[in-house]
Amino acid sequence: MLIIPAIDLKDGHCVRLEQGEMDKATVFSEDPAAMARRWKEHGARRLHLVDLNGAFAGKPVNDAAIQAIVEAVGDEMPVQLGGGIRDLATIERYLDDGVRYVIIGTAAVKNPGFLHEACDAFPGHVMVGLDARDGKVAVEGWSKLTGHDVVDLAKRFEGYGVEAVIYTDIGRDGMLTGVNIDATQRLAQALSIPVIASGGVTNLDDVRGLSAVAKDGIIGAITGRAIYQGTLDFAEAQKLADELAGGVFGV
C-alpha cells in the first residue's frame, strides 16, 4: 500500500485547506518543486497534486508550478494530478508534460460519457476523484453537494477502464481527525476498481487501520496536513504500510 504525499497548489504555492475551504488555506511552501523533491528524498513512490485554483475555475491554472514539480521528481516518482480537468486536450497536454495519471472529478460526475471517452483515449492513465460529505458526492471544488451516493456512482464506472478511484471524505480533510476507514472499506468492497483513501490520514493508527483492510482493494492513502505539521512521519508511515500491506496489488 502506497503512502502518497499531497501537494495542493493555490496561486503557485503549496497549501493545505480545511474541508476544502479556499479561505482556510495554510501555506506550507512557496516552492512546491522543492517540496516535491523533499518527498522523493524521503522515499515517496508517488505524488498527489491538486490544482486548487483549477478545481474552482474549471480549467488549468497552476501550469508553471505543475511543470516544475514534474521536472523536479522525474519519471521515478509518478505524479497523479487533479483539478480543473474537463477536456481531452488538457489530459493529453498533462500526459505529454510528464504527468502519469490524471484525476477526473467534477467532469466524471456531470458527464460520465467524457470519463469513458478519456479512459478509451488514454488507457491506464485516468483516475476518478470522488469527494463525499456524509456519503453524498460533492463537485466543483467541493462547493456543491449532489444527490449522488458515492458507492452507487462509483459502481457506474465499472468497465470504463478507470485506473483507480480516489475517495475523499470532505468532513475529515485537513482536520487531522483520522481517516474514515469504514466508508473507504465499504467503497473498496463494492468495486473491482482499486481505491485510494484520502482525507484525515493523520497518524500511524490510520496507516495500521487502512493496511488491515488493504486486501479489500485499497492500494494507497494520500496524506497532506499530517506530514506537513508532523503528526505523521512519512518514511515511518511507508515503512509500516510495507510491513503490514506490502505487495498488495503489486504496489
Swiss-Prot record:
One of its GO terms (biological process) is L-histidine biosynthetic process. The keyword Isomerase applies. It is found in: Cytoplasm. It catalyses: 1-(5-phospho-beta-D-ribosyl)-5-[(5-phospho-beta-D-ribosylamino)methylideneamino]imidazole-4-carboxamide = 5-[(5-phospho-1-deoxy-D-ribulos-1-ylimino)methylamino]-1-(5-phospho-beta-D-ribosyl)imidazole-4-carboxamide. The active site is at D8 (proton acceptor), D131 (proton donor). Its main location: cytoplasm. It holds the Pfam family His_biosynth. Pathway: Amino-acid biosynthesis; L-histidine biosynthesis; L-histidine from 5-phospho-alpha-D-ribose 1-diphosphate: step 4/9. GO terms for molecular function: 1-(5-phosphoribosyl)-5-[(5-phosphoribosylamino)methylideneamino]imidazole-4-carboxamide isomerase activity. GO terms for cellular component: cytoplasm. Coiled coil: none annotated. Its EC number is 5.3.1.16. It is an enzyme of class 5 (isomerase). Keywords: Amino-acid biosynthesis, Cytoplasm, Histidine biosynthesis, Isomerase. Belongs to the HisA/HisF family. NCBIfam families: 1-(5-phosphoribosyl)-5-[(5-phosphoribosylamino)methylideneamino]imidazole-4-carboxamide isomerase, PRK13585.1. PANTHER family: 1-(5-PHOSPHORIBOSYL)-5-[(5-PHOSPHORIBOSYLAMINO)METHYLIDENEAMINO] IMIDAZOLE-4-CARBOXAMIDE ISOMERASE (PTHR43090:SF2). This is 1-(5-phosphoribosyl)-5-[(5-phosphoribosylamino)methylideneamino] imidazole-4-carboxamide isomerase.
